Each structure stands twice: as structure tokens, then as C-alpha cells.
């Protein structure tokens, strides 16, 4: 099954995490790169951006207290609104309403997630609906939403005790055409970031 981009949130022990995976048919030559407290998805060939403006973006941004994950530039808006005092649910909802779905041929949904404390928020903006849900996380929980097929908020079997292991676990989910993945994992002093690029 091809599900496109995947946003995941979860909890391992006392640590919450977010994860992101690129699965792609059209632009598989992409990588995830960590820089500071953010992870960026970008094409190997920068000129590919001229063919599709949606293929490069910050997929994860983290502060000491929360982490945001999404499949587009709305990562920044969600992060900034939470920094300015909005709750995660409101920040995700407002940002998805503001951005809407991607204006490409497939009308690709925008998806997003936030973890803060022991709570998570997942959201999706499709061409015909916008949905946002708050989830209270328990140890071992993992939830996902994807751009195609798996567009509901559903539990997924994943585990890991670090950003690196979460990124690899997400990459290994049994969905077609994985390209790269990334994760942010809560530590005592903030969020640890990791990326997985198999080639």
C-alpha cells in the first residue's frame, strides 16, 4: 500500500516523540537533514524545487517543551503559534485552516502532529475536510496519519528508545516506496533529533 507522507506521534516510557517519513513516487531523490532544533526534507538536486515547490520544507521543529511535525511549511506556523501561547490543538487547527490542502494535481492533504507533556495532537487538511484530534499518550502508544489511504488517526505498531530508533522504525513500516525518515525524542534537556537516509 502506498500512503505517501507519514506523521507519527507516540510515547516510550516517560518520553514522547514525533516521527516523519517521506514515501514518494514522483520525487524519491530526497533526504532528511537535521540542523539545530529542526529537520528539513530537501531534494538531492536543488533544481527539482522548480518542478514542485512542495518537496522541500521543515518537517520537524522542536523546543525544550514541545515538538511539531508536518509535511510542509505549516510546521513553522504551528511552532510559532505555540511559542506565542496558543495550545497545540488550536495551533494545529488554525494552521491547517489557513494553509488548506496542497494545490497540486493530487490535492495532497496537509498533515501535522504535536507532542507536549503527555499529550499529542494530530491533524489533516484534505480537499473536503479538516480534522484535528487530541490524544492522551500512554507508554507504548504510537499513532499515525498519512497523506493517502491512511488518512484517519490510527494506532500503529512502532517502538524505540531514541530518536534514531524511532526514525528507523518508521522507515520500516510496511508501506511502499520509503525514501527517508526523521524523529524527535524527548530527553531531560529537550528533544533529541535523528534522521535516517538509507542511501
From Swiss-Prot:
Catalyzes the cyclization of 5-formylamidoimidazole-4-carboxamide ribonucleotide to IMP. InterPro entries: IMP_cyclohydrolase, IMP_cyclohydrolase-like, IMP_cyclohydrolase-like_sf. It catalyses: IMP + H2O = 5-formamido-1-(5-phospho-D-ribosyl)imidazole-4-carboxamide. Keywords: Hydrolase, Purine biosynthesis. Pfam families: IMP_cyclohyd (PF07826). It comes from the Archaea. The keyword NADP does not apply. Pathway: Purine metabolism; IMP biosynthesis via de novo pathway; IMP from 5-formamido-1-(5-phospho-D-ribosyl)imidazole-4-carboxamide: step 1/1. It comes from Methanothrix thermoacetophila (strain DSM 6194 / JCM 14653 / NBRC 101360 / PT). This is IMP cyclohydrolase. GO terms for biological process: 'de novo' IMP biosynthetic process. Its EC number is 3.5.4.10. Transmembrane segments: none annotated.
Amino acid at each position: 500500500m502506498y500512503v505517501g507522507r507519514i506523521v507519527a506521534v507516540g510515547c516510550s516510557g516517560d518520553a514522547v516523540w514525533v516521527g516523519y517519513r517521506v514515501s514518494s513516487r514522483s520525487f524519491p531523490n530526497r533526504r532528511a537533514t537535521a540542523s539545530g532544533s529542526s529537520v528539513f526534507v530537501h531534494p538531492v538536486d536543488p533544481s527539482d524545487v522548480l518542478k514542485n515547490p512542495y518537496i522541500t520544507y521543515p518537517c520537524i521543529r522542536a523546543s525544550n517543551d514541545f515538538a511539531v511535525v508536518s509535511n510542509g511549511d505549516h510546521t513553522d506556523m504551528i511552532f510559532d503559534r505555540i511559542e506565542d501561547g496558543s495550545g497545540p490543538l488550536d495551533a494545529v487547527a488554525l494552521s491547517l485552516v489557513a494553509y488548506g490542502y496542497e494545490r497540486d494535481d493530487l490535492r495532497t492533504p496537509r498533515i501535522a502532529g504535536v507532542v507536549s507533556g503527555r499529550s499529542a495532537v494530530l491533524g489533516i487538511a484534505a480537499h473536503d475536510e479538516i480534522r484535528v484530534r487530541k490524544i492522551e499518550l500512554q507508554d507504548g502508544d504510537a499513532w499515525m496519519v498519512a497523506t493517502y489511504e491512511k488518512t484517519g488517526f490510527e494506532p500503529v505498531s512502532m517502538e524505540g528508545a531514541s530518536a534514531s530508533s524511532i526514525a528507523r522504525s518508521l522507515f520500516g513500516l510496511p508501506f511502499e516506496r520509503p525514501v527517508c525518515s526523521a524523529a524527535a525524542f524527548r530527553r531531560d534537556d529537550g528533544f533529541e533529533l535523528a534522521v535516517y537516509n538509507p542511501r
